[in-house]
């Protein structure tokens, strides 16, 4: 399937981060996402910068750059407390990864996406009841390929702000064995919420205020 980012717009968004332990909710930080259009080596591209600030989860910044017309990955860079931890640079042959003082190249075949671009991909898919899509992914921090499976669960009334409600698609997404849920506003193409089980009775949520 051909995936294009033409429907996306440049945005800046802030979400609160919550840890929910056995039903008890605690705010533990915030995350900022900036999406902008750039030119990389003559190609139209999208740069997504996600910054996480949390005393509990740490301070991270991930920069994902993908081709605008195909969603093919160009690069991913991960920073922890301001220090670069991982740099992945993609080419037709595969991916070259630099982690601290070590480097390696991994051959990748066929069409694949960077796992950190999935939150962009979800916003441009033709989501509807019963929709599903498998993707081949690559996670640079894990240095491994990941099978991704996207499936629409249902349409759910989502409260946005104090008195605004929208019909959002609730989307179940597997990254290998890891399951996350996303809520997508089909009109604005906005990612409203993300939820994942990270331990026994422990849920991590990113939610628009």
Residue ranges of predicted features:
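Acidic, serine/threonine-rich low-complexity disordered tracts
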Residues: 1-92, 133-209
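Surface-exposed beta-loop interaction hotspot
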Residues: 92-138
């Amino acid at each position: 399937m051909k995936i294009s980012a033409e429907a996306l717009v440049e945005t800046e968004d802030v979400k609160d981060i919550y840890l929910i332990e056995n039903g008890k909710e605690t705010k533990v930080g915030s995350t900022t996402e900036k999406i902008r259009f750039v030119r990389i080596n003559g190609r139209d591209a999208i740069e997504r910068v996600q910054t996480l600030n949390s005393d509990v989860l740490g301070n991270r910044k991930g920069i994902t750059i993908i081709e605008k017309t195909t969603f093919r990955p160009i690069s991913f860079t991960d920073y922890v407390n301001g220090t670069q931890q991982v740099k992945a640079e993609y080419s037709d042959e595969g991916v070259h990864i630099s982690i601290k003082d070590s480097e390696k190249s991994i051959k990748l075949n066929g069409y694949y996406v960077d796992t950190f671009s999935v939150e962009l991909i979800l916003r441009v898919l033709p989501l509807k009841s019963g929709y599903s899509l498998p993707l081949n992914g690559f996670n640079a921090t894990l240095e491994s390929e990941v099978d991704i499976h996207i499936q629409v669960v249902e349409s759910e009334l989502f409260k946005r702000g104090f008195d605004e409600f929208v019909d959002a698609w609730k989307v179940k997404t597997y990254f290998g064995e890891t399951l996350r849920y996303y809520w997508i506003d089909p009109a604005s193409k906005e990612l409203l919420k993300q939820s994942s089980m990270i331990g026994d009775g422990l849920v991590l949520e990113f939610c628009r205020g």
